[in-house]
Amino acid sequence: KYSTFLDLYDSFGVYVADDELSKSYAKAYGVDTLYQYQHGGLPNIACEWPTSSYLNFTLLTATAYSIFAPSNTAINHFFDNFWKVGGYSSLGEVDPLALNYFLYQFIYGGSLVFPEEIGTGKLESLLGSPININPAMLNEKIMCVNGALYGMNEIQEPSAFASVVGPLFQYRDARSFLYALGGSSLISSYTSNLVKYIMLVPTADQ
C-alpha cells in the first residue's frame, strides 16, 4: 500500500562505513568494517537508533521521527496532477532533487507527533515548511521503535510545492534553476508563508 513511498525513499539509500560499529562489533563477525544502511540527504528512518554511539544518551533517548506516508494511489494521483503537467512522463523520470524535497514534506523530525497534534497548523517539516495534513485523511496510525508512521490516502499539496518555488519542483525545464537555488540554501526562505515574493524562473535553455 505504501511501497511507492518506500521505493522513492530507498532510491537515496547508501551503505556507509561506520567506525563506531566496526570498532565494537566487526571483530565478532570476522570482518574489518561494518556498514550501516542510510538514506543520503534524508533522515535515516530505517535505523532503529539515530546514532551508533551508545554513549550519546541524550540523542538516543530524545530523537524520533514522524512519517506521514502517502499511499501508492495518493502518490500516483499527485504525479498526474503535478509532475505530469510539468513535462514528466513517469515517476521514475522525476528529478532526484525534486523527489528529495517531496519526501521531506512528509517528515517531522526530532520528536514524536501524537494524533491530537496533527491539523493544528503548528507542525513543520525538517525543511521548515508547514506540514499540510488533514487528520481525516489518515487511515494508518502505527507506533514504531524510532517514531510514528501515519498512512494517508490523499495528499494535500505540500506547502513548499504550493509556494513561489513550486514550479521549480514541477517543471522539467526549470531543473537548472532548482539546482542553482538549492545550492544557495535559499529554498527554505522562499517557502515561508510569512513573506510574499515574485520569482522569475529561467528555463534550462535560457
Positions of PLM-derived features:
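Mature, structured domains of secreted/extracytosolic soluble proteins
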Residues: K1-Q206
